[in-house]
Amino acid sequence: KQGSSGYGAINVQVSADYKVVPVTRSTAESASTIENPDVSEFALKLVSSDGSFSRAWDSLADFDPATKIPVGAYTMSAFYGDIDIEGFEKPFYLGETPVAVRDRENSSVEINCTLANVKVTVEYSDAFKKYFADYSTTIHSTGGEYIEFSKTETRAAYVKPGKITIQTHLKKQNGIESTFEPAAIPNATARQHYKIKLDISDNNAGEAQLNISFDETTETQPIKVDRSEEHTSEL
């Protein structure tokens, strides 16, 4: 009988750790509740080690633990979202674990999922808001989308790990506009939360300068973009 000698079953349990690691401090923080998908919404995929067998389920709720699986070595993954779909409120959670299916046995699998893309938020200081009539910030991960944070945007965006460029568009009260790239995040990794903060202050010469920070190295020594620099000379 086909199911009696060469097949087993899998009992899977999926959990999700919604904590992200802010690069401005050492303690992890929980992601916004509204962005925390229920594990029942996570999709499942089972792939044999030799690639000869692959099966997917749209959700954990669709998976029947009585499903007969050919004996062999597998990797089972659970995921929510898509690494290639970037944007606001687009977290991508992923977890995977190896599992051995044995004849007429029920193998238990526990999969813990964590954020597999990068969380980015943008904040503007009150001084910054008063100085400029309009402003926006656009981030771009290598090979990914261009995501614009308008002046009123408060949501988090999620992008692929890797290099992330930061572009800022500013409009002064007198109508003069300028666009420049004040900084880049060279190697953002999965599960990190970058809080990009933009501020404006006066330097020792009494000239307005922009300050941008996004990690522990620029938190106390922000990158300064002076009005005298080429990219912002019009400001």
Which residue stretches match the model-derived regions?
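Signal that preferentially marks extracellular ectodomain short beta-strand elements
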Residues: R55-V71, D82-I85
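N-terminal, post-signal-peptide region of Sec/Tat-exported proteins
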Residues: T33-D58, D64
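Short beta-strand segments within Ig-like beta-sandwich modules, predominantly Fibronectin type-III
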Residues: S54-A61, E145-K151
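Extracytoplasmic cysteine-anchoring/structural motifs
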Residues: K1-A43, K68, T75-P91, E96-D103, ...
